[in-house]
Swiss-Prot record:
Any GO BP: isoleucyl-tRNA aminoacylation
Biological role: Catalyzes the attachment of isoleucine to tRNA(Ile). As IleRS can inadvertently accommodate and process structurally similar amino acids such as valine, to avoid such errors it has two additional distinct tRNA(Ile)-dependent editing activities. One activity is designated as 'pretransfer' editing and involves the hydrolysis of activated Val-AMP. The other activity is designated 'posttransfer' editing and involves deacylation of mischarged Val-tRNA(Ile).
The name this protein goes by in its record: Isoleucine--tRNA ligase
Lineage top rank: taxon: Archaea
A GO term from the CC aspect: cytosol
Species annotation: Methanocaldococcus jannaschii (strain ATCC 43067 / DSM 2661 / JAL-1 / JCM 10045 / NBRC 100440)
Length: 1039
């Protein structure tokens, strides 16, 4: 053991990291456990698209804390780090670097090959940056063997997975309405869009469609996407709803509008804002099914010639039926464009309507009046056109939730395109059953996950992009047949232009795009141009990360709540397809990090907290502890800088306790030896019991994991059990003679407790714990704290002792509160206290009377009732009056004759009969009346009564403590060592009878003549109002 100095936790981080690196500690820990039971962890991969943020820091700290615990429990932890390196997150960043404004410029400005190379460079560069940041947080993972989806081996397993899906009939190419990003020019999957809805303002337009065969009669529709009216092919009504023919008089004309009956008033009120409506009335009512087949004239027929062709079709421009129609706003008649809405698409197929989507990849019209115009830019002109045609009922704005691209944040479009899908709908029931086998933390995530699966559609896995795993599908240009290639070996066997392509070392575009295969029909097969959804990449992780084609269930995974419908789902979906099972056993969902006001952190708001800045100021361990203790990890975390100061205070308290203990041990050349355990006092046995109880709680809660209970338990032990209680109890014992058994027992207790505390603390605060361990360990101990197990010495746990001490601490706390109330500081002794309570309290007080006296500074303790006190009965006249009315005086007379204390005890059991009257507890208030010089303070199991009388002797003793405190403060100012002796001289107060005590407490010697190195004047005020002006002089003996 070496003397401990005050700590800078950031510098401590660096020192311990250096120790770990120089001694290869991580590898030695893995080596120690390599033959033990395996624990398989799959790292949810962060995107290599920039520096880490507080959320990713929290995520890795959760993982690292749990895995450190598992290693310490002896498991052979498989802990590969993982990275997400494909997809739009990287592409968008690289586009920004090159000033690329749209997808076409990738090919025209720099070319696909260079773009792919730059994406790879970007991903690898930021992988290194982020890895360094994670290491800065103290995160131990297998960084050297991290899994990267850009490797040939990983991508090949992706191909194999898709081929299995194909062989099982779960892969299909189909024309469907999908989410489409016009900026990235690609389709997106449903799960990518969940959580990406934002509140926006869009047009709110009510439009009339004139019926073809009924004069002056119109159906009224409502839409927030006027641009889709260009592609309208039908109007849908609910077959069972009531619809009204409404005769409307307005603007000097009369028309009939067809509107759902329940929405007539709402629609007319909207119309009044645009038209001078004089009168309206319902002239006819029909069911929705009676409207089926009614033809209307398309409102933009002249603006889009294609609509004239559609008008010739049987079901186009007609009213059709659909169960999806609601009466929650709008008109009850739904504008239907099968090429631009999922429900529109389904109902359109039912009526054999064309799947018409007249827009290109950039979201621009490809025909008609607005050809070449971005659809959203056409909204205003379309509305104006409708107005000019007399078809506009109302136009305004509406604030609603609308999906955006998860990477570039552009509002998405709904667009019918041909895409590749995994038909999850066919195995959805299996997926739901699998989910029920997982241990979800918190448990309600299971319901959230299953509900998400119930509503999820087939997985659109194709992306019209570049940087990703190419879809391994080759299509024959002659017959249209396609094959799915499952490996490089298979590809090399079937390729017909090997000489042109050469050896296949990279599976990215454009390399694989050059490869041609021969079809059975003799035609040439080319690869489809799409790449796989990046969530397909991460979904492969449970088996592709370790390079196997078999199910290996992860023992533990954890990610933020946005991943419930993303990564938790994507890896499950793929494993369900390939292995018919779920790839993880335990899944913890954590929250998001927010600013102190609960707002999302963003650069534009200027509220981003950089984890590197926090670590630089406080050290990694303090950030780690804060993030795991601020609240339950599944709740969103509000980061508050001032709360980091609270954690700093906690760790300083821990370090000060450690420094206090070790520096006294070093001073006395203490050598730990279990033989000193035979000299333990009750307070020593108590703290030993407590640290083992804490270890037990820690193990139980880390196993779940419930990090909040684990960290809160540690905090309570450090602050309340160790620092504020045990060290206070044994402080005087450290000043005894060097070989005193009582002192050595205290040292051995502190040594044992600090060593075990460091072990318990190690998962969350690895640097601090390692530093403490390295100074406490003996030659026969393990090289690192992480080669030790968190263990519980059950034989040392004494629950009765812990209960007794808890009562005593409550009593002492009550004394402190009483002192505050009567303004009588702890330095002045109390003449006497009386403690009232049950047998449990009496036993604890008798056992630890010496502690109560010492810690409460009390001269005498009694148990029971206070002399001169009495219980009195106060009738509750309001309650008595309700029951007994005119007989209340007789009831009060009966109460006055009763024994108050006896009545109080009887009322605890329920109602009591006095002189024939029923007395309920609410009829009376029974309270204890105590003498004026007694102050009563309640605690959890009783009351402490403090005798507040002050005597001269009590004041003198208090003054002695006042002087000791001031001499100690002056020693601190002088920066004296603990053992350094001093000469002292005190003027202005007579303390001759306490000289020996003062000399012992301050390691000093009173002298008459002094050459002061430091002197100071003090004013001391006593509780009885007296003032003393005291001069204290100190001279160092060893100068």
């Amino acid at each position: 053991m070496k003397k401990v100095e005050p700590v800078n936790f950031r510098e401590l981080d660096k020192k311990i990291k250096k120790f770990w690196e120089e001694n290869d500690i991580y590898q030695k820990v893995k080596k120690k456990n390599e033959r033990n039971k395996e624990f398989y962890f799959v790292d949810g991969p962060p995107y290599c698209s920039g520096a880490i943020h507080l959320g990713t820091a929290w995520n890795k700290i959760i993982k690292d804390t749990y895995l450190r615990f598992k290693r310490m429990q002896g498991y052979n932890v498989l802990d590969k780090a993982g990275w997400d390196m494909h997809g739009l997150p990287i592409e968008v960043k690289v586009e920004n670097e090159f000033g690329i404004k749209n997808k076409k410029e990738i090919e025209t400005k720099i070319g696909v090959k260079q773009f792919i190379e730059k994406c790879k460079e970007f991903a690898l560069k930021h992988k290194e940056i982020m890895e360094k940041q994670f290491k800065n947080l103290g995160v131990w993972l297998d960084w050297e063997n991290a899994y990267m989806p850009i490797t040939k081996e990983y991508m090949e397993i992706g191909w194999w997975t898709l081929k299995v899906a194909h062989e099982k009939g779960l892969l299909t190419r189909d024309l469907r309405v999908v989410y489409w990003c016009p900026r990235c020019e690609t389709a997106l999957a449903e799960h990518e869009v969940r959580g990406e809805y934002k509140e926006v303002y869009d047009p709110s337009v009510y439009v009339k469609f004139r019926l073809a065969n009924e004069e002056n009669t119109y159906i009224v529709i409502w839409t927030t996407t006027p641009w889709t009216l260009v592609a309208n092919l039908a109007v849908t009504v609910h077959p069972d709803y009531d619809y009204a023919y409404v005769e409307v008089e307005f603007d000097d004309k009369k028309e009939v509008w067809i509107i759902a009956e329940k929405l007539v008033e709402e629609v007319i009120n909207k119309a009044k804002k645009f038209h001078n409506i004089k009168n309206y009335k319902i002239i006819k009512k029909v069911k929705g099914k009676e409207l089926e087949g009614i033809k209307y004239i398309h409102p933009l027929l002249e603006e889009n010639e294609r609509q004239k062709e559609f008008a010739e079709l049987e079901n186009a421009h007609t009213v059709i039926l659909g169960e999806h129609v609601t009466l929650e706003g709008g008109t009850g008649l739904v504008h239907t464009a099968p090429g631009h809405g999922e429900e529109d698409f389904e109902v359109g197929k039912k009526y054999n309507l064309p799947i018409y989507s007249p827009i290109d990849d950039e979201g621009k019209y490809v025909e008609g009046k607005w050809k070449g115009v971005f659809v959203k830019d056409a909204d205003a002109e379309i509305i104006e056109t409708l107005k000019n045609k007399g078809l506009l009922v109302y136009a305004g704005k509406i604030k609603h939730s609308y999906p955006h691209c998860w990477r570039c944040k552009t509002p998405l479009l709904f667009r019918a395109t041909e895409q590749w899908f995994l038909e999850i709908s066919k195995i959805k029931d299996n997926i739901i059953e699998h989910a029920k086998t997982v241990q979800w933390i918190p448990h309600w995530v299971e319901t959230r996950y299953i509900n998400g699966v119930k509503f999820v559609g087939d997985w659109n896995i194709s992306r019209q992009r570049y940087w990703g795993i190419p879809i391994p599908v080759w299509v024959c240009e002659k017959c249209g047949k396609y094959i799915v290639v499952g490996s490089v070996e298979e590809l090399e066997e079937k390729m017909i232009n090997k000489d042109e392509v050469g050896e296949i070392n990279d599976l990215h575009k454009p390399t694989v795009d050059k490869i041609k295969l021969r079809c059975e029909c003799g035609g040439e097969m080319k690869r489809v141009p799409d790449v796989l959804d990046v969530w397909f990449d991460s979904g492969l992780a449970p088996y592709a990360s370790i390079g196997v084609k078999e199910l290996k269930k992860a023992d533990f995974i954890t990610e933020g709540h946005d991943q419930v419908t993303k990564w938790f789902y994507s890896q499950h979906a793929l494993s369900a397809i390939v292995f018919n099972d779920i790839p993880y056993k335990k899944c913890l969902m954590h929250g998001f990090t927010l600013d102190e006001h609960g707002d999302k952190m963003s650069k534009s708001l200027g509220n981003v907290v950089n984890p590197d800045d926090v670590v630089e100021k406080y050290g990694a361990d303090l950030l780690r502890f804060y993030l795991l203790s601020a609240n339950k990890v599944w709740e969103d975390l509000r980061f508050v800088w001032s709360e980091m100061d609270d954690v700093l205070s906690l760790f300083n308290t821990l370090w000060n306790a450690y420094m206090f203990a070790v520096n006294y041990m070093v001073l006395d050349n203490f050598k730990p030896d279990e033989k000193y355990f035979e000299y333990l006092k009750d307070e020593d046995r108590w703290i030993v019991s407590r640290i083992n109880s804490v270890a037990k709680i820690a193990i139980e809660n880390l196993e779940v994991p419930y990090f909040h209970t684990y960290t809160w338990t540690l905090k309570d032990f450090i602050l309340n059990d160790l620092s504020r209680w045990y060290i206070r109890l044994i402080r005087d014992r450290t000043w005894k003679e060097k070989d005193d058994a009582d002192k050595l027992a205290a040292y051995q207790t502190l040594y044992y407790v600090l060593l075990k505390l460091a072990t318990i603390l190690a998962p969350v605060a690895p640097h601090t714990a390692e530093a403490i361990y390295q100074n406490l360990k003996t030659e026969d101990m393990e090289e690192s704290i992480f080669m030790n197990k968190i263990e519980v010495d059950e034989e040392f746990i004494d629950e009765e002792l812990e209960r007794d001490m808890a009562i005593v601490r409550d009593v002492v706390d009550a004394i402190y509160r009483g002192r505050d109330r009567i303004k009588y500081t702890l330095r002045y002794p109390l003449k006497e206290i009386t403690i009232a309570g049950g047998e449990e309290v009496k036993k604890a007080v008798e056992r630890f009377e010496y502690i109560i006296k010492e810690q409460g500074n009390v001269k005498n303790i009694k148990f029971g009732e206070v002399e001169g006190s009495k219980y009195i009965i106060k009738p509750n006249y309001r309650e008595l009056g309700k029951r007994y009315r005119s007989e209340v005086p007789k009831v009060v007379e009966a109460l006055n004759k009763a024994d108050a204390k006896e009545l109080m005890e009887r009322l605890k059991e329920g109602a009591v009969i006095l002189d024939g009257y029923e007395i309920k507890p609410e009829y009376v208030e029974i309270r204890l009346e105590i003498p004026e010089h007694i102050a009563g303070v309640e605690f959890s199991k009783g009351t402490v009564f403090i005798n507040t009388e002050i005597t001269d002797d009590l004041i003198k003793e208090g003054l002695m403590r006042e002087v000791i405190r001031r001499i100690q403060a002056m020693r601190k100012d002088m920066d004296l060592d603990i053992e350094e002796k001093i000469k002292i001289k005190v003027e202005g107060i007579d303390l001759d009878e306490f000289k020996e005590i003062i000399e012992r407490e301050v390691r000093g010697q009173f002298v008459d003549e002094i050459k002061a190195d430091y002197e100071k004047d003090w004013e001391i005020k006593t509780p009885n109002g007296e003032k003393y002006n005291v001069k204290i002089a100190i001279e160092r003996i060893n100068k």
